[in-house]
């Protein structure tokens, strides 16, 4: 049965077609917002996957290049692996959806979103987010939805609901908020130092808009939604928990997890698990789920310790940060390096500077963004958690963590005019026990400062956690969560910022949303903690950016020329610019607007190249003194080169004060001589003189 629904959303029409396409999917919706079209589907396997202790949810966001009238690049001329934007969008969709599936559901579920056309006024990422929630809501897949998402931009202090792509790219706020009918369930933000109060206001304006979308989804579900199918529960039987408590009492489990040493805790749990394995040796069903059962036993113990007893596993107070350490310049010869340690989480960040020709090229659906100047890459090797496995390159988690730390620093980076460099920061995880992305933010900030990047302000990040009870008022917010509190808690609320405001937020949640008091307390806690980190730790390692770039970094000078003179600098088939490069050893980049960047390791060579470019692009003025090289000798005079492609002639009568019969009597090829420009002769040609050069020139 085909039905079409529509609603007005932020001044544009959102249209949803159900039953028109993809009838074999569990749920499908074809959405059009303006002229942006996205096909969203939800499918689930018939049976649970054996031998797993997690919910196997996959989310895909497919960018089809035909959506913007492009043919993909490369030899294959078809879409390849997912872009960074696709991965980040899929993660944003995953985070609010995952908590709304049953906790004991183990069937494979795939949410697929295919972008089929793009209207620059309506961002496809937002449409896909709404589409995934709707397709799942009307399907027969067990799901405690719907949820809805809204994006908020800001320009000149005014909020923009669901901004256009241009408004999103150029605004001061990039906020995405997902909500259920009662609570906020996901927050993702990048911001130009937005004050905490303004950010909270924006979050709850999104929450209000979400309620209209949820009402729209509920109407569709009531009319054509499928009944939810029955499924095989993978819940641990209560009698198994009772037997486990007989073998290891809650007090013994509490003693096992109550330590600030991650390795000690893991060894304690390993020994406890061995006891259970011996006791349940003849019960194959219980052995099959023992790992999940031990996890849940630990979880109940830790949550009770925190919520009821106000005891954290490592003995810290609720608002206490782990021991901190920071240092810079630990790696020689690189352009900038720093290490930041928080408890058993340790990040080493290394910054590399390069000319602007090294910026990352982006071929995506957003035609406003074709390059990326600042790149932050995050690596998470297995040794950082004491494990052994081969490295297969960055996964979605690594890409997500790198993007978060990147987003945190972008607002404080200098402009291209102020600092004409491409910048790459790489965060290497040396040790991990929670919140490595926030440690990466702190380390990369210090590394940029050590490299001489003139960032406007210092940035730090911290994460807060949460443990909730049976009611909305029964909760405890934790500052600086470690791994165990992340695993067994309900929230990972990451916030980065300066002293003056927030630059990034990422909220991961395991429950059905947060009340406003929790959101406000978490944001307030993170501000207090990040200010402490900057003032008491980071600023003592490096208080401000170095005045000059590192000695091993390339030096870059930038000048601006008349765009009409670009051809003179380049020369026929690149002859002139290649000659400048060959003579000086520098690298030259020229934009269409006439911005010329000259990059090299030798300041003298850079200055020489810039002088050449200035000579090439500047008309000679009467009285101007120049140095030229004799490149040709004729009977009537000598030709001098002042820069590649820029020559002038000195008549034989202007070479020496006394009369000479032959130019060769005074000049030879390759001689460097000073000349003065005499202006134009009767024929309109520029003439030069050697003999009229002032003695003090």
What residue spans do the PLM features occupy?
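Single-stranded RNA-binding regions, centering on S1/OB-family and related RNA-binding modules
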Residues: 290, 552-558, 563-697
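Short, hydrophobic beta-strand segments
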Residues: 113, 185-190, 231-235, 244-256, ...
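Flexible, glycine/charged-enriched surface loops at secondary-structure junctions
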Residues: 103-109, 144-146, 213-231, 283-290, ...
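Glycine-rich, flexible beta-strand/loop modules in the N-terminal catalytic cores of phosphate-handling
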Residues: 25-110, 115-117, 122, 188, ...
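Mobile "lid/hinge" segments at catalytic clefts and subdomain interfaces of large enzymes
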Residues: 140-260, 448-547
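Conserved phosphate/anionic-ligand binding catalytic regions in large, soluble enzymes, centered on
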Residues: 27-29, 37, 122-141, 327-351, ...
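Extended amphipathic alpha-helical scaffolds
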Residues: 1-45, 49, 53, 232-369, ...
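Long, basic N-terminal domains or extensions that often function
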Residues: 1-232
């Amino acid at each position: 049965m085909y039905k079409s629904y529509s609603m007005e959303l932020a001044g544009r029409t959102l249209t949803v077609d159900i039953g028109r396409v993809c009838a074999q999917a569990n749920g499908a919706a074809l959405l059009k917002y303006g002229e942006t079209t996205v096909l969203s589907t939800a499918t689930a396997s018939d049976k649970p996957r054996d031998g797993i202790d997690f919910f196997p949810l996959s989310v895909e966001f497919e960018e089809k290049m035909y959506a913007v009238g492009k043919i993909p690049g490369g030899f294959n001329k078809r879409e390849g692996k997912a872009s960074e934007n696709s991965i980040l969008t899929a993660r944003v969709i995953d985070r609010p959806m995952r908590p709304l599936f049953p906790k004991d559901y183990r069937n494979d579920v795939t949410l697929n979103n295919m972008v089929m056309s793009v209207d620059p006024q309506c961002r496809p990422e937002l449409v896909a987010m709404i589409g995934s929630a709707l397709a799942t809501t009307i399907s027969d897949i067990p799901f405690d939805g719907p949820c809805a998402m809204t994006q908020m931009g800001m320009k000149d202090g005014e909020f923009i609901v669901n901004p256009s792509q241009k408004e999103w790219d150029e605004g001061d706020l990039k906020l995405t908020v997902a909500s259920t009918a009662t609570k906020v369930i996901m927050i993702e933000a990048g911001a130009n130092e937005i004050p905490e109060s303004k950010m909270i206001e924006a979050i709850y304006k999104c929450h209000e808009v979400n309620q209209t979308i949820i009402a729209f989804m509920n109407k569709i579900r009531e009319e054509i939604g499928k009944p939810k199918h029955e499924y095989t529960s993978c819940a641990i039987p209560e009698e198994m928990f009772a037997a486990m408590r007989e073998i290891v009492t809650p007090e013994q489990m509490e003693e096992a997890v109550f330590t600030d040493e991650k390795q000690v805790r893991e060894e304690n749990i390993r020994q406890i698990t061995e006891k259970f394995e011996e006791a349940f040796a003849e019960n194959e069903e219980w052995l099959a789920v023992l790992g999940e059962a031990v996890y849940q036993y630990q979880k109940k113990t830790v949550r009770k310790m925190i919520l009821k007893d106000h005891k954290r596993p490592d003995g810290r107070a609720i608002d206490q940060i782990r021991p901190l350490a920071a240092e810079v310049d630990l790696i020689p010869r690189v352009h900038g390096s720093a290490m930041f340690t928080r408890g058993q989480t340790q990040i080493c960040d290394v910054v590399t500077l390069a000319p602007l020709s090294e910026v990352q090229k982006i071929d995506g659906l957003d035609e406003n963004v074709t390059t990326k100047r600042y790149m932050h890459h995050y690596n998470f090797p297995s040794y950082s958690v004491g494990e052994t496995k081969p490295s297969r390159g960055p996964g979605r988690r690594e890409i997500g963590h790198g993007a978060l730390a990147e987003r945190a620093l972008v607002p404080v980076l200098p402009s291209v005019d102020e600092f004409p460099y491409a910048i790459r920061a790489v965060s290497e995880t040396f040790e991990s026990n929670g919140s490595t992305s926030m440690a990466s933010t702190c380390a990369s900030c210090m590394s940029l400062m050590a490299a001489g990047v003139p960032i406007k302000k210092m940035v730090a990040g911290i994460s807060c956690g949460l443990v909730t009870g049976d009611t909305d008022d029964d909760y405890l917010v934790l500052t600086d969560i470690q791994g165990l509190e992340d695993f067994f808690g309900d929230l990972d609320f990451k916030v980065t910022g300066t002293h003056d405001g927030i630059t990034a937020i990422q909220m991961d949640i395991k429950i059905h949303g947060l009340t406003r008091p929790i959101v406000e307390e978490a944001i307030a806690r993170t501000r207090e903690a990040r200010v402490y980190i900057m003032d008491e730790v980071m600023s003592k390692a490096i208080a401000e950016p170095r005045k000059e770039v590192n000695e091993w970094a390339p030096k870059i000078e930038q000048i601006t020329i008349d765009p009409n003179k670009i051809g003179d600098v380049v020369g026929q088939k690149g002859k002139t610019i290649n000659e400048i490069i060959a003579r000086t050893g520098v690298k030259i980049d020229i934009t269409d607007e006439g911005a010329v960047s000259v990059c090299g390791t030798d300041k003298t060579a850079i200055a020489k190249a810039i002088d050449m470019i200035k000579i090439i692009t500047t008309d000679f003025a009467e009285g101007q003194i120049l140095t030229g090289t004799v490149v040709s000798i004729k009977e009537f005079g000598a030709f001098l080169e002042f820069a590649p492609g820029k020559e002038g002639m000195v008549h034989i009568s202007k070479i020496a004060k006394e009369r000479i019969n032959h130019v060769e009597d005074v000049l030879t090829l390759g001689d460097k001589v000073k000349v003065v420009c005499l202006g134009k002769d009767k024929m309109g040609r520029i003439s030069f003189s050697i003999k009229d050069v002032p003695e003090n020139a």
